[in-house]
Amino acid sequence: MTDSLTHTSPFLVAALYHFVSVPRFADLQAPLQTLCEENGVKGTLLLAHEGINGTIAGPDAGIHAVLAFLRAQPEFSGLEHKESRASKMPFLRMKVKLKKEIVTMGVEDIDPNKVVGTYVAAKDWNTLISDPDTIVIDTRNDYETAIGTFRGALDPKTKSFREFPEWVRQNPGLHNKPKVAMYCTGGIRCEKATAFMKAEGFDEVYHLKGGILKYLEEVPQEESLWDGACFVFDERVSVEHGLKEGEHRLCHACRNPITAEETTSPLYEEGVSCSHCYHTRTEEDRLRYRQRQHQIALAKKRGQRHIGS
C-alpha cells in the first residue's frame, strides 16, 4: 500500500475471516455491534459456530480497536486480516449477523477446520500456476470473473458459490492433471472449496493464501499474472494492483460491475439498467428502479444517503 494512497484515503478497510469452533458465538454479537458503532466502524461481520467472516471500514483507530477486541477472544487469537484504503466510507451501516455458516457452499460435512488444501504464499503463486501440471480454478462467481482473473484460469461461470460443487462433479477432466490451484477474493471460499476437492478425491490441492487481495498487495505489477481488476463487495466495487481503488461502477439494478464505457450504452440508465440486465428486466422493474433512483437523488440533495443507494 503506497504512502500517497494512505494520505489521500482516510478510511482503513479490513477484510478478515477465521475458521475455528466458536460454541458461544452468539454472545459476541451485541458487544461487537456496540464497539463498532462507538468507533465509527461500518461493514458486515458474520458469526457462526465455524468462525467469523467479514469486511469492515472506518478510521484507523476504530478498526484497530475492533481487531484488538476480536483477538482478545481465545478463539480468534490467531485472526489474520488484510488491509486496504478507501477514499470514502464504503459501507452504509454496521451489521453483525449470526449465521449457520460463514460462507455457504451447500455441502454437508465440509469442515476446513479438519481438512483443507495447501496454502501458497503470493510470492510463490506465479511458479505454481505456470506449472504445466497445474489446473488453475477461479472459485468466484461470473460477475466477479468478468472484470479480472489470472491468466489461464478455468472460469466455472457460477452464479453463486452453491453451484461450484456441481460444476466440479460435471467436469471429470479436472482429474487430468496432478495439481489443482484455486483462488478467490480473500481466501475464504477456497477454504471450503479445497476441503471439498479433497473430499472428492483430489490429492494435490493448493490455494492462494490471502486470496487475490494479498497477491495484488504484494506482487509487483510488472511481475503479475493477474489481468484486470478484482471485484470487492463494497462501494469501491473493484481494486487494482497495490489495492488502488478501481474505476468500475455498480449497476444498482443487477449489482454487476460496469466500466465507464458501458455507461455510454443506450441500455444504461443510472440505477435502472445496464447492458447486462436490460433484457432480463421488465418495464415494471425499471419503473420501480426509477422511483428508487429518484428517492436517492432527493436524499443526496438533503445531504443524506438513501439506504438503498
Swiss-Prot record:
Against PROSITE patterns, the record matches this protein to: RHODANESE_3 (PS50206)
The record's EC number reads 1.14.-.-
Q: Where are the transmembrane segments?
A: none
Tell me yes or no: is Oxidoreductase among this UniProt entry's keywords: yes
Q: Which InterPro entries match?
A: Rhodanese-like_dom, Rhodanese-like_dom_sf, TrhO, TRHO_N
User: Superkingdom of this entry's organism?
Assistant: Bacteria
The answer to whether the entry has keyword Oxidoreductase is: yes
Q: Which residues form the signal peptide?
A: none
Q: Name one GO biological process term.
A: tRNA modification
User: What protein name does the entry list?
Assistant: tRNA uridine(34) hydroxylase
Q: Which gene encodes it?
A: trhO
